[in-house]
């Protein structure tokens, strides 16, 4: 790629497959030959532990220490901060210390731009940077959206997400207007789909009817699968854990959809 793209994976609802999607799309990009960094920006540290660092609270360096160095005008030592995962992605881990920054950032000058300023030097090293946001619309998520070029929104298909989606899109719009006018919505990906239930079928139809005129709704639908949760406890991606499973094939398909969308945009930009 000619330049790095930063993608925030966000939804204030928990249990929508957000971390699983961030992890597997990021590793999917790496499997397609791209240089990828994943930033765990959730104080729960689920992405960090899902990638095999189970004792993440004991890590000496994490995303919170990076923010701390920046706030205190100290140098950020990226080499000791960034972890290397065997599946060819780099990781900036998170632990519970990050929870303190929701309050600490309140008194920081240009507080919404803190993460953006921290990762700016890393843009030259990667094709894609993924940010796994916390399940909230607080200051951490606003920081992630301010740092991002695009936001990918996982939406689970077990219930109608209308209110939650409206709130999230309002937050994205507010960040676009006031902080980051370059922010775009990458698309909506439907997750945890059980094709045997009427609620899943109804939700899929409602999401397409409600949003597809203005927002890309990806064709790929991620199925509900125990393999996905098993993979996260093994420290591996779904491709490594169960490469022939339906959920692995779905994430592979989603990754290709996102890559093809990027290639099409590059072609259109080049032809102008």
Predicted feature locations:
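P-loop NTP-binding core
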Residues: 1-272
